[in-house]
């Protein structure tokens, strides 16, 4: 009987160990997303805006939760062939994981999914001159994410009407990546 209890405990602990990186899709602990991130993939329904020199091709390097619940993003983007560093604050809204910012129009930024330790997926809706653009971005804590996270990102893109032709692998694309 004791042997069965010990075996059950060992199996429970082993199962818990494999679920350390469970995806979170709501009720985010925003303090846990603070830190360094690397852009892995980006997708949009307007490819011009995320292609080289596109105004929405942003390489987040660091995220910081501010005291008021807003997020500070330190990122880079290409401007006339040069990698330029910029800091931007996305203001929190009444919804957990939702933020707003004025950049190249009006933007709603949603944290879609994260496990805090490996990856994070953001959705941004930009409205510029009456035109709506969707952008999704996959970031990792390390420079290269595994294929599992990339497949999950592709599945989420599909939910927003974007297929594999709308996704750019950013790990091999720009000077701003490193």
Swiss-Prot record:
It comes from Mus musculus (Mouse). This is Epididymal-specific lipocalin-9. It holds the Pfam family Lipocalin. One of its GO terms (cellular component) is extracellular region. The keyword Glycoprotein applies. Disulfide bonds join 83-176. Expressed in epididymis. Not detected in all other tissues tested. GO terms for molecular function: small molecule binding. It is found in: Secreted. Its main location: secreted. The keyword Secreted applies. Residues 1-16 form the signal peptide. InterPro entries: Calycin, Lipocalin, Lipocln_cytosolic_FA-bd_dom, Maj_urinary. Glycans are attached at residues 46, 68, 129. Belongs to the calycin superfamily. Lipocalin family. Coiled coil: none annotated. Keywords: Disulfide bond, Glycoprotein, Secreted, Signal, Transport.
């Amino acid at each position: 009987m004791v042997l069965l209890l010990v075996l059950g405990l060992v199996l429970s602990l082993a199962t818990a160990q494999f679920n350390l990186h469970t995806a979170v899709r709501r009720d985010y602990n925003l303090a846990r997303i603070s830190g360094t991130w690397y852009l892995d993939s980006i997708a949009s329904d307007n490819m011009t805006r995320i292609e080289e020199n596109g105004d929405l091709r942003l390489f987040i390097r660091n995220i910081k939760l501010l005291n008021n619940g807003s997020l500070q993003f330190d990122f880079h983007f290409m401007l006339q062939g040069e990698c330029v560093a910029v800091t931007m604050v996305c203001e929190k809204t009444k919804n957990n994981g939702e933020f707003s910012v004025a950049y190249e129009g009006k933007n709603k930024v949603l944290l879609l999914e994260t496990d805090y330790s490996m990856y994070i997926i953001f959705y941004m809706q930009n409205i510029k001159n009456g035109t709506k653009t969707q952008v999704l971005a996959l970031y990792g804590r390390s420079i290269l994410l595994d294929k599992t996270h990339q497949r999950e990102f592709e599945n989420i893109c599909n939910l927003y009407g974007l297929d594999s032709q709308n996704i750019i692998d950013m790990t091999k694309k720009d000077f701003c990546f490193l």
